[in-house]
Amino acid sequence: MSQTENAVTSSLSQKRFVRRGKPMTDSEKQMAAVARKRLTHKEIKVFVKNPLKDLMVEYCEREGITQAQFVEKIIKDELQRLDILK
């Protein structure tokens, strides 16, 4: 196969799926993202004291991580420390 044929074949197989019809609204996109996230994650809701939350936000911004990543890390670290998670 020549390079030209190879390029055409690879570009055809890598085409993006184009959604036909009316574009999704921002809220529909958000709902779809949450639905995908729920397939692999569970939601937790907690109330923490304001100073702790403020410190967490500062730390996350400084480290370039999300608050969810921070919470997952401290839960994982504590479960490993307790020998619950290996």
UniProtKB/Swiss-Prot annotation:
Keywords: DNA-binding, Plasmid, Plasmid copy control, Repressor, Transcription, Transcription regulation. The keyword Transcription regulation applies. Residues 1-31 are annotated as: Disordered. One of its GO terms (biological process) is plasmid maintenance. The keyword DNA-binding applies. Residues 1-14 have a biased composition (Polar residues). This is Replication regulatory protein repA2. The gene is repA2.
